[in-house]
Amino acid sequence: MKKGLILTNAYAKLAAFSNQSSRLKEELEKLGAQIDVLKNDGFFAYINKQGEIETSLDSYDFCIYLDKDKYISQMLEKRGMRLFNGHQAIVDCDDKAVTFIRLANEGIPMPLTLSGLLCFTPDEKVSAATLDKIEKTLGYPLIAKACFGSLGKDVYKIDDRAELEKIAETLKCKPHLFQQFIKESAGKDIRVIVIGGKVAAAMLRSSQTDFRSNIELGGSGSAIEIDETLKQTCEKVASLLNLDYCGIDVLIASDGYRICEVNSNAFFGGIEKVTGVNVAARYAEHIFQQIYKK
């Protein structure tokens, strides 16, 4: 019996999360697998007194890891379970600064990026010298982001020194970064889905009310054909990060594309609707190829 697991976060409440797991379960079961969907509070994984990892999940052939809990993913992988995506790929995509560093020096076009200085003393103010460096390097407007976050949260457009000082203070005690604002891409970007190293679908996302184009923030999507240059770039990004599946957000600059973010658990409900591509089926087929048809 082919048996797989879809693991989700116990605190995830958005309908998009349940859609993700139910669609994948549906398509995997069409291929003949028994699929269980578990929240991460529905099993145990721990290190016992002998220093060995124990888990209640040993009966599964694979796990689609729809979570970002890096400790559980590392334990499961060290125990021998095949994860989609793998532990390190999830970690590298979850931290935006790490993503950019991993892609650096590889010919991947990205916005000009500064890592924010991490403050361990909340009462300390961000120095004028730090603000000067950010201003001089990026100019206005610029973008500030927390390194951890999804759905457009903790992403700020900064227009002047006063806003920079305020947001720098807000973010100083958490990992964060500052980036060049790509004005041509304000309120729009391209979401590209890559599965098994190949582009599977793409859509243009746009918003009339926000510089962020996330569907979850009120943006809309439309099907788009992307050129060979962008296809090759996105496939290279997925390869460099060792991703079985991902959604890549691409900014559109006057002189070409810029990779903005890479999402290891990108929602696919919206892109399935606007493109007609059965993303869940493509992902299920990739998993079967990796697990059962080697």
What is the role of each PLM region?
Residues 85, 194-195, 252:
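Generic beta-strand structural signal
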Residues 10-122:
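Conserved N-proximal alpha/beta basic substrate-recognition cap immediately N-terminal to
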Residues 151-237, 241:
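Phosphate-binding site of ATP-dependent enzymes
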Residues 142, 200-201, 246, 258-260:
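Protein kinase-like catalytic core scaffold
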Residues 249:
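Nucleotide-cofactor and metal-assisted catalytic machinery
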Residues 66-70, 183-184, 244:
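Short beta->alpha connector loops
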Residues 225, 239, 252-294:
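C-terminal active-site "lid" helix and adjoining low-complexity regulatory extension at the edge
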Residues 2-10, 14-15, 21, 90-187, ...:
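Active-site nucleotide/adenylate-binding loops and adjacent lid/helix of ATP-dependent enzymes
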